[in-house]
Amino acid sequence: MVELDPNNIPQHVAIIMDGNGRWAQQKGKMRIFGHKNGVKAVREAVSYARKVGIKVLTLYAFSSENWNRPKKEVNALMALFMQALDLEVKKLHKNNIKLNILGDVTGFSASLQNKIHQAEKLTENNTALTLNIAANYGGCWDIVQATKSLAQQVKEGKLAVDEINAQVLQQALVTKEQPQVDLLIRTSGEQRISNFLLWQIAYAELYFSDVLWPDFNEKEFNEAIIAYQQRHRRFGGAEE
């Protein structure tokens, strides 16, 4: 693999993990087979991110629109989520990785909410990498919940309208004090944002990979970082 510039590693990488279903269909399998193999790709992505010094990795696991999928698939995804929490959290903790679940967790079963709380509590003081799993998440929902939170603070006299600015709103998003996204990766060849981290990707570099998510490995991730390092980020400014 091409070596990375250690002085130009993106702090925050977000990934839209797309293509599990198509990967399974290409192999004549049920869609859930693709999701299960997608978990293996998650493990490899997390390991790579920690190894190269990425500080925050956000993975889009289940959007608020995914509830519209067939009930059988949704139920299988919820069971897989529970299983992954059981199997992976201790490994994350051992590797000093902090886990956050971003999204409206009240939409999940009480047992899943309890597992989420336990996992976040166990890993809350870890510092090597912050792993955000966006589940029952949508970028529009995130901005709306932040706006409601600020409106409630104004109503209670804790915040003046004139004090609301971009920084204050950003702190009210589910990502809170985390850095803005530097690099957004989407797999499977699709070139859409799909309501993901709409505020947080304002100045992100976009990288679209034709590889289906279960086949997205360390080599593919490395190529995405290389592409990022070859770009000149202007943040709205002019070319020098």
UniProtKB/Swiss-Prot annotation:
SUPFAM superfamilies: Undecaprenyl diphosphate synthase
Gene3D superfamilies associated with the record: Decaprenyl diphosphate synthase-like (3.40.1180.10)
Domain of life: Bacteria
Positions with a binding annotation for substrate: 19-23, 31, 35, 63-65, 67, 69, 186, 192-194
Name of the protein in its database record: Ditrans,polycis-undecaprenyl-diphosphate synthase ((2E,6E)-farnesyl-diphosphate specific)
GO biological processes: cell wall organization; peptidoglycan biosynthetic process; polyprenol biosynthetic process; regulation of cell shape
Coiled coil region boundaries: none
Keywords in alphabetical order: Cell shape, Cell wall biogenesis/degradation, Magnesium, Metal-binding, Peptidoglycan synthesis, Transferase
